[in-house]
UniProtKB/Swiss-Prot annotation:
Protein keywords: ATP-binding, GTP-binding, Nucleotide-binding, Nucleotidyltransferase, Transferase
The tr-type G domain, residue ranges: 25-239
Lineage, uppermost ranks: Bacteria, Pseudomonadati, Pseudomonadota, Gammaproteobacteria, Enterobacterales
Organism this protein belongs to: Salmonella gallinarum (strain 287/91 / NCTC 13346)
EC category name: transferase
Region G1, annotated ranges: 34-41
Gene (UniProt): cysN
Protein name: Sulfate adenylyltransferase subunit 1
Amino acid sequence: MNTILAQQIANEGGVEAWMIAQQHKSLLRFLTCGSVDDGKSTLIGRLLHDTLQIYEDQLSSLHNDSKRHGTQGEKLDLALLVDGLQAEREQGITIDVAYRYFSTEKRKFIIADTPGHEQYTRNMATGASTCDLAILLIDARKGVLDQTRRHSFISTLLGVKHLVVAINKMDLVDYCEETFARIREDYLTFAEQLPGDLDIRFVPLSALEGDNVAAQSANMRWYSGPTLLEVLETVDIQRAVDRQPMRFPVQYVNRPNLDFRGYAGTLASGSVKVGERIKVLPSGVESSVARIVTFDGDKEEACAGEAITLVLNDDIDISRGDLLLAANETLAPARHAAIDVVWMAEQPLAPGQSYDVKLAGKKTRARIEAIRYQIDINNLTQRDVESLPLNGIGLVEMTFDEPLALDIYQQNPVTGGLIFIDRLSNVTVGAGMVRELDERGATPPVEYSAFELELNALVRRHFPHWDARDLLGDKHGAA
């Protein structure tokens, strides 16, 4: 066991008390990105090493692996802690997205180490989709490169609001303050084209030597700011989903016996309480929450991010892919939308093509109507194209086979994000983020027969405890 971990457990009074303390720590998900060979994997290895998160057997294996695959001579090659694929070690690059977990006294962390090579940009987008913060590494010798711009744009496109620009390999430029200042100015000039609500910070460091990673550097006394670890421990993450209206995509209908019917899923945004009136989309049927069931027992209220099962007071038709929201919320299903797309397939995306799309638990078919433009990553300008190539990013107009309950991605990533699936190979070929909604072709108002209206009025008059909805409620309100 890691001796530091053993000491922490002892200080907390045992394993159970230590685990409870861990559960109450805040969690930060972040990714490392940047151009190839900027030192992303080495930086993560340094963080794990300097925060004493490496076990004795891992350290022993690292010594052996450094001799066989290392690129740092007699020094430990810390990148080998995260470059686990054989191809990665042979080529000295990152290919897949590698996830690592560690914690300090202040916070828990999940790290996504993403590839720097352009052909693996799709892997980088996958890693960024769940993160709150991005560390953008820049080689102090090379400055801002195309991949730096590409990864910055993709990160912000996927909703990342906190960017830490880590100017790495300062040891190779003699810890020069002028080099740091020049790269900082270059990046800020580029960042003027990014969304204006970003939190951008700069840290000069050397992942190989450990300068300004977990401890202040004696070689850069001109820098008085926080270390990288201090930034990660103290950054205030405000998740938009906590402030958004309640959205609950149904992932599974749980029916273990005749006495229980629950709707399982993860609460995408907002909160829900027992007794609250809810509405089901696309049907529009209403009910109220009878129970909120979790692994640890029933709750009175659940918040965004919690995995729950909702039990309703009425037996109504709800299937996987339906969306539950507050009864007083208005969300009109749409068949047409403009989608920001990151294309991940060798075959280009072109108008006229059809794909399966998956949104939360909902799966349907969509047709590409037009490509408005492709983004030139070098200068973030828009250009007209006939198709979107591998790793291309652009704005695409789509039509769905059926109306979908969608949100704008920047407001709610779960109900505003989707993936494209090839219908023949079942391979994921693209990621989409809803930019604009067009309600053309949305579900038209329902016309009820005279018999249905009379029956509805009869039920509401004689059985008020059924809470039946007034089918003419909207028209009565207008009158």
